[in-house]
From Swiss-Prot:
E.C. designation(s): 3.4.13.9
Nucleotide-binding is among the record's keywords: no
Alphabetic keyword roster: Dipeptidase, Hydrolase, Manganese, Metal-binding, Metalloprotease, Protease
Entries under SUPFAM superfamilies matching the protein: Creatinase/aminopeptidase
Keyword Phosphoprotein: no
Cofactor requirement: Mn(2+)
The protein's name: Xaa-Pro dipeptidase
Catalytic activity as recorded in UniProt: Xaa-L-Pro dipeptide + H2O = an L-alpha-amino acid + L-proline
Function: Splits dipeptides with a prolyl residue in the C-terminal position.
Record-listed Mn(2+) 2 binding positions: D247, D258, E424
């Protein structure tokens, strides 16, 4: 805890420095950051699970309390209004007392609407608001031009790519939780449990509820692995176990882990060998990574490796690996991007930004679903998650195209019952090395 305290103190200094610079550039006095408000279910008296504003949890590790407020100006100690009402209907969070509370000015907010008079001395025409409720900002007297001002958001989003020591420490803790879940899920798969029960084993091991994980767990058996974001969770076990893909994370102090593994249930099958080769290809790509290279270059290099596997297994024949890539023959097998920035959000902000003004560099036309085009730099946390799938809807156009004779359609049918493969690690870019948080915890 003592180490986390010193890291948090430096983290707050970094956020204060960024805020001071942002306010100066945008001619603002302060920024009001709203944790958010519950969203009610239509024609019902219940709410959807609360998800906190990412800009809020960047400052304080409070992720499950609505109606909280931060006022920051880059100079004075951040003011934190913590909502803790008297309520016998619902559980109420007590005022926090932890290593981080000494770095902010903690103020008890007993009633939601009391924030009006609490903030009155601080709100002026040069106050910005970052949060989900425009009407609430208006009621507090914030100028509409300063509500989620895009230029201000661009500034914050750009620098969010560079993680502080505190953020990296939190992300390493999230990795530990997620790895525990992945080990439990693998054992549940080996015990031939259903997707639903595998997911329960994962949640138990991480100490999370379904609403706590940073994204809906993808727990896919057999051909379900061909659905990139499969979240159905069958209660019934399949008649035959062929493959298992799990894409699941965890969260610590608001920071996410995002890990994927694929397993084969068949010892002597080409799919088992393909999983191993994909794992080797992913590790080989990471071994080449370094600061100063554009992320999209690594995405293209992964497609070259996919072409090599298509050639090795005879899935695509009679065409060079170079032409496979240039003509897009690898894209139905790897339809998504190599990965993305990771942090306060799973797909963290600023992946396309080339500067703090928000200059946008789109993904290459051939790879429209790539989520990051930035130069890889020290302090960044990225996912590396190549895939290799057998998806009918993506392969269908190639059955009729000019390259149709180069595909071994019989072999593709042979692989289809296994769905596909995705292998994902979370890495930190350092000056002279790549830290693989996932592999450092010995998750094979």
């Amino acid at each position: 805890m003592e180490k986390l305290l010193s890291l948090y103190q430096e983290h707050i200094k970094t956020l204060q420095n960024r805020t001071r610079d942002a306010l100066s550039r945008h001619h603002l006095d302060n920024v009001l950051i709203h944790s958010g408000e519950p969203i009610g279910v239509f024609l019902d008296d219940s709410d959807y699970p609360f998800k906190v504003n990412a800009h809020f949890k960047a400052w304080v590790p409070v992720t499950d309390v609505p109606h909280c407020w931060l006022l920051v100006d880059g100079v004075n100690k951040p003011k934190f209004w913590f909502y803790s009402p008297v309520d016998y209907w619902h559980s109420v969070e007590a005022l926090p007392s932890s290593y981080w509370t000494h770095e902010i000015e903690l103020i008890h907010l007993k009633n939601v609407d009391d924030i009006q008079k609490e903030l009155a001395p601080f709100i002026n025409k040069n106050t910005a608001y970052i949060g989900p409720n425009t009407q609430r900002a208006d009621s507090l007297g914030v100028s509409l031009d300063n509500v989620n001002n895009q230029s201000l958001l661009n500034y914050y989003h750009y620098y969010r790519a560079y993680k502080t020591g505190y953020e990296l420490a939190c992300m390493r803790e999230a990795q530990k939780m997620a790895v525990n879940g992945h080990i439990a899920a693998r054992e549940a798969f080996q015990a031939e449990l259903s997707e639903f029960d595998i997911n329960m084993a994962y949640l138990m091991a991480t100490g999370h509820r379904d609403t706590d994980v940073p994204y809906g767990n993808i727990v896919a058996l057999n051909e379900h692995a061909a659905v990139l974001h499969y979240t159905k969770l069958d209660h019934q076990s399949p008649d035959e176990y062929r493959s298992f893909l799990i894409d699941a994370g965890a969260e610590y102090n608001g920071y996410a882990a995002d890990i994927t593994r694929t397993y084969s249930a068949k010892e002597n099958h080409e799919f088992t060998a393909l999983v191993k080769d994909m794992n080797d290809a992913q590790q080989a790509l990471i071994a080449t990574m370094k600061a100063g290279v554009r992320y999209s270059e690594y995405h293209i290099q992964m497609h070259q490796r996919i072409a090599g596997l298509l050639h090795k297994y005879g899935i695509v024949k009679g065409i060079s690996e170079e032409e496979m890539v240039s003509e897009g023959l690898t894209t139905p097998f790897l339809p998504h991007g190599l990965g993305h920035a990771l942090g306060l959000q799973v797909h963290d902000a600023g992946g396309f930004m080339q500067d703090d003004k928000g200059t946008h560099l789109a993904a290459p036309a051939m790879y429209p679903f790539l989520r990051c085009t930035r130069i890889v730099e020290p302090g960044m946390v990225l996912t590396i998650e190549p895939g290799f799938y057998f998806i009918d809807s993506l392969l269908a156009p190639w059955r009729e195209g000019k390259y149709r004779s180069h595909f071994d359609w019989h072999l593709i049918e042979h692989f289809k019952p296994f769905g596909g493969i995705r292998i994902e690690d979370n890495i930190i870019i350092h000056d002279n090395k790549i830290e693989n948080m996932t592999r450092d915890l010995h998750l094979a």
